[in-house]
């Protein structure tokens, strides 16, 4: 069973585009949540992830970081392990 992936983004963020491109390339289903105009969601995101930047990526509710962290997990093979519990 594949894990649930959520990607918190803004509309103009190049790192968000990069992270989503990797997920699409790997055929990993994900839910995109645009926080660009929602202060409440942004506030929650900072509390949940400890970060003020986007994208922030969560796998089964656990923050894994942003685009760089996602790419590092993919390169090391760890992303596949996180996705298939």
Question: Each PLM stretch: what is its role?
Answer:
Residues 62-85:
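Non-catalytic, surface beta->alpha helical segment in thiol-disulfide oxidoreductase systems
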Residues 1-29:
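Local sequence-structure signature of Cys/Sec-based thiol-disulfide redox active-site neighborhoods
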Residues 10, 51, 76:
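ATP/adenylate-binding site constellation spanning eukaryotic-like Ser/Thr protein kinases
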Residues 49-58, 68:
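Structural micro-motif
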Residues 22, 26-27, 47, 72, ...:
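Non-catalytic interaction surface on structured domains
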Residues 35-52, 82-85:
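Thioredoxin-like thiol-disulfide oxidoreductase module
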Residues 1-9, 59, 78-84:
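Long, low-complexity, intrinsically disordered polar/charged segments
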